[in-house]
Amino acid sequence: MLREASSLVGLCLALQVAAFSEPLIKFAAPDLVPHGASQIVDHAFASFSFPAHWLPDFAGNNSHPNLFSRDILDLLDRTYYNSSQKESIFVETGANGIPSAVYVGPVYFEAFHNFPGSLWSFQANLANNATWGLNNTLEVCEQVMNTLKSSLITFEIGNEVDLYPCAVRPCDYDIHDYLQEWTTYADAISESVLRGNRYGLDEQKFFQALVFANAELKSFTTPNAFNGGIDLTNHVKSVSLHHYAAGNQAWVRLQETFMNHTAVVANLSIYSPANNYLKSNYPDITFLLGETNSDYTNILMNQVEGVFGSSLWLIDYLLYGMSLNITRFNLIQGTTFGYTGWVPVPTGSMQPYVRPPLYGQIVVADIIGQNPHVQIFPIDLGAEHWKFSAYGVYESTKLSKYVLVNLDEWNSTTRYPRPTQKVTLNFPSGVSSATVQRLLGAGASADSDISWGGLSWNYTHGRLTQSGQPHHEILRITRGMAKLTIPSTEAVVVTLG
């Protein structure tokens, strides 16, 4: 027994030594934007998606606006409109936080006023197969248009129609049946709602199409939809597909599933064929992930969702999506969803609060910054560095930032000290210094005490409040090179001086 115990101690010590001795990684991004960099990034790249039943929580109404959500910001296919309904919203309970039906009244639409300056895409109901379904959709679309006016940018018809067969449609329902329905609805909305509108909205090319749950499933593919004639009437403005990194499978782990650059690459690369098809054949139609986040089951998997490690995953996820020329990610939010960036209303004994994923989005917003010509270049580190990701950021064709994410999972309960990764960075000639900002948390499983560049945010008396002091380090550059240390489970943004 003593001999076995000694062997175990020796193994643990060897693991500890290995944890502290990470090999040096060298990074070099070209001075000028290289081939393989992204298209110019839309400054609305990291947007939000609100299911219909959660919108009142996040936005409020005219008499009780949710100023907490408004500060943070400075619809699903099961929605039916009832013009005589006094309540803003009535929900029929469903599974995983998703209702089986949502009934909304006129007060519901006041929510849109509470995010001034925002642009909206509204999802019109297609799943309702009742005889009154189309008329109800037309009624709600008209109400939405008259509420949002010029802030409305698209109508999206249907939600995850590739999952309709054997659910809300017959089992033999296929892409051709969908195209007939979609065209009928688009023609009707164009003719009855958009035609002659007073808000300058395009009367024809105003629809976000497909909205599939998968990159491809049986006959439901992007090429099949366009070869089948979805744009023969020139209705399609954009194409949306949905993506979630995982569900609640037994194999889901924070390190292997999320804090894993190789997994991020594999997850998002399956959308490249659809995106490339559109760019080659329909270059004026934009491609986006119109509903995306970490977990499609929407349950509280606290060990992988809503923790500091998920904010690091989100940074890598969004930046790699930019590098693939996906135009926008709409990050779905929900009051009870484990991955939501903030809880907008009191729940149980808890007041509203900010959750770790929001920090990932704040960091990405700062990475994009204010320059109108930002491009992202993924730095290939090889398969051996799957727990580290790196990007060069270019502004007006010139290297302006490095983004470095150490995805190695570490927690305050881990039985060895926090490892560090030493890196060297190359810089253009003439650059003598850079600033370093860090996204810090106590560990991958931390759900509080997070800071970005020295600042933290949370809810106080109905508003978003900021605490801390802005903080950055100065990185001295010698002969075009500098060294930097990045602890495990940390992200760093290096901005050239």
Question: Positions of the model-derived regions?
Answer:
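Fungal secretory targeting signals
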Residues: 1-24, 282
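Carbohydrate-binding surface patches
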Residues: 382-430, 438-443, 492
